[in-house]
Amino acid sequence: MKKVLVGIMVFFTFTITQACAYNLKSFSSDSKILSAMQLLEQNGEYEVFANLKKNAVKVKFYHLSMSNVYAANAYDEFGRRVILINSIYKDAPVEQIACLIAHESCHTARKATLDEETRATSKEASCWAKLKRTGVSYPQTKLTKRLDKIANLHIASVEDGNNYIEDKIANSSFYKSQFNL
């Protein structure tokens, strides 16, 4: 009887795992991006994949002429959504690439709003807080500093109930002009 129950449990576990697994290659062909997506999947970031799948999104590295842009959402010639990760971050740690994907996956509107940007940045920050490995020395790049900063804002927001990420975005001159605040 125990063997039958164990067999049934193994069968259901395998079946559920396969049902939840995403075909990551449907999102990208780049090995670094696929590794980042695998890391997101292994850490239970299923919301990221639900957003990507719902919107049939592709993810790729792309030379973004503005070096201060980490990643962006765009549309291809067929109207399909594409997440463009600035190619200057191609050598960034896979955990950081995963955070950029998580952020951009939250954007669904053609024009971002304060609420959407806050959700996206909060998702990016929570992913970094989860994925950043203790004891690993990450390169002190602009991206690392940004991720550390927003992760600290996210943690502080969770601790005291204030939304420091939204405050930071709302007070940013870049976003003030973008959102007409």
Label each PLM-derived region with a short phrase.
Residues 26, 30, 90-99, 113-117:
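Solvent-exposed, acidic/flexible segments
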